[in-house]
Swiss-Prot record:
Gene name of the record: LALBA
Role description: Regulatory subunit of lactose synthase, changes the substrate specificity of galactosyltransferase in the mammary gland making glucose a good acceptor substrate for this enzyme. This enables LS to synthesize lactose, the major carbohydrate component of milk. In other tissues, galactosyltransferase transfers galactose onto the N-acetylglucosamine of the oligosaccharide chains in glycoproteins.
Annotated Ca(2+) binding sites: 79, 82, 84, 87-88
Location relative to the cell: Secreted
Main location: secreted
Keyword flag Calcium: yes
GO molecular function annotation: calcium ion binding; lactose synthase activity; lysozyme activity
Protein name, UniProt field: Alpha-lactalbumin
Organism: Notamacropus rufogriseus (Red-necked wallaby)
Tissue: Mammary gland specific. Secreted in milk.
Transmembrane regions: none
Amino acid sequence: IDYRKCQASQILKEHGMDKVIPLPELVCTMFHISGLSTQAEVNNHSNKEYGIFQISNDGWCAEKQEDVANSVCGILCSKFLDDDITDDIECAKKILQLPEGLGYWKAHETFCLEDLDQWRC
């Protein structure tokens, strides 16, 4: 699914993300990393990034079922490519607990620190 910004914002709000991070910043970041597409899959050096949040297989999710228990989010990376973004959001909440928060996604600093009016719904 390719979401529109206000669709994405509404779903994020339904899952309490507005209490974690300002939604315009988050939606802007998501747009710049995945185009708000659940099917975005990117090879990034030796890692692969999945879904609307571009969650990395570098410890956050697992490529193989037998590695799921050792991943931070306890999920197969391929699950981030389906149309249900509930599990993506739950994993993103864990990423946002990192000291760098939204800074985990480089696009945030580059594109989403100011002039956020276009990302409001």
